[in-house]
């Protein structure tokens, strides 16, 4: 590709030499392409070429078949004639004889006479007046402005009209607002991205109503787990588990009514969450178990999810930690999401969120805001159709999320298949947000998206404001339901027959729009569920930990140390996880004294051995482990060593699989042998010793100590922003395998030979060299590591 016009234009605009301008442009475009490839999971340029990694929205089938062959499209729209007409119009405007005013713009922030926004100063003012004064008339003015889509055509749902299901009924016969609001949740906005004041205001409001607030991916302060003296609760009912696993402790998980696995975010699909360093103060860093002042970036994927089977394992892990909580999976709206949602249900998730591109835009990159994601209407309709066709719909609750604002939006979402409804921007506006678009700068003037104590003091929101907003929505929904003859929300879920497209669309480009694929209702046998009506069977009745919990009762009830010996097989997954959930529920993150529950096992453990292991629980395995050993380690101790009968060199033998200690918070892990890839990825505080590791060791690590007494693979320490890693570099080639973007290598300042001897847990770890300890470490890390290994 030769972008000659870009080269010539930039050369004319810049005083730099032409070669420099071209080099800068190529570098910028290359970075952009790499970003897109990363978001879409593409590793090579050849795979990028012809990948058609986009959906067609509002293009006619004939146009797509001819010019974008193979591209998926759910909504019919413009053909070549309309495109040609618009191109001609633009050309005429550009080369008209008279001087024309430049467009006002306003693609990002609202401007008068600029691009239309759903949130304008008028709608923001109407909503805030309504909720602060509890003024229904002001809310009606707000809703009327937002719902007026016939003129502005801002959303797909604006093209729908409601059809009556029967004769209108009195409002008194409709489900009360107090029940409807229990279907509402607030979006996943992390503590860190928004202030404590804003975060707790949302939580208190939702808890009072019986709805649910969402922590986002930044953890939650422990003091919020206990009710306030007046009976209110600041505890978020939904605890999110994102790819960064920030703040995901066992205690965090047991204090949840729902645990949400964030696969992606509607506003920026394919990207991990990011928190700029200037928003990571000491308090935020403490909650997230990271370093103050250092920006935090979640990996684009979950490194323990590369298939539906892996997702099923994570669902199983989380249900073992907290078997009373629902497990949710958050997906992004796109063509094909229905197939993914079916897999999620088969992985035994209890809840699926379909996230649209309109929401979550506070700090998303501009390119993602304008070019990524798709409307929730598309993904929700496909999800409903796919789940109903496969008789899976009754097993899962489906939530629509991303840009919901009014009761009309809720009604359309329900008819397209949603059981529940997520709101984020609108509740923040009810609490005082004025859409300054400064969320990423830490300069929010109303104290919401900032950690600056001076700005936080300006926060004037209250739980009552958020509660008023949600009750206004519920009352608007009730009025719609009464007008079309519906008594209960579940009666309208999946009822696309109650939606009709507008017969007159006041825009010349919209004449070819066809929404029939969104409104398709699968033909199914009578009795096939259209909404969530049953509970998933998670297979927890006979898990291995039931026996461990029974044997550990003296420690759990009286604090008496216990020693348990069992054989284990690879069908025994998540060993120690349910036991740790019991410890955390009773004793919090501190758990029990070390080795209070000592479990000695023999055999081959299944996936997620020692996942979320709580303080006071020690698992010693004589044998080997599979993937995800010590995932989310929360203070416990994991030891994996070769069987006594083994006749092999542990430095040459893989003893545990991939992604070991993913998201570990605290605790210790010792492995007599080699680990697979991504050892200690996102380690936040655990201390680990291993005799070798594969590629990507210590990736995204923010704390803790890792000692590798053997060779490692490539890309060591990629994205590592905290913690210390020691690597035995016998052949002097380690530097070539280390990613130096964020770390530096230091030779040993002072050496101390550690004799090879048993360290108290069953044998030598190091058989081929000497461990070197730096003498100038802070916080006693050197002494601690010596003691652990020795």
Task: Say what each PLM segment does.
Residues 2-65, 69-105, 415-418, 422-505, ...:
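Gly/Ser/Thr/Ala-enriched C-terminal appendages of enzymes
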Residues 2-13, 34, 45-70, 204, ...:
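Alpha/beta enzyme core
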Residues 3-7, 18-247, 256-269, 278, ...:
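Flexible, glycine-rich loop/tail regions that form catalytic "lids" or insertion modules at the edges
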Residues 15-27, 35-43, 113, 117, ...:
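Hydrophobic alpha-helical scaffolding
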Residues 20-32, 40-43, 59-63, 78, ...:
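Generic recognition of stable, solvent-exposed alpha-helical segments in well-folded globular domains
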Residues 177-180, 317-319, 554-556, 714:
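Short, flexible, solvent-exposed loop/turn segments with mixed acidic/basic and small polar residues
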Residues 218-220, 332, 596-599:
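Long, charged, glycine-rich C-terminal linkers/tails
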Residues 455, 467, 480-484, 493-496, ...:
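Long, distal/terminal scaffolding or interaction modules
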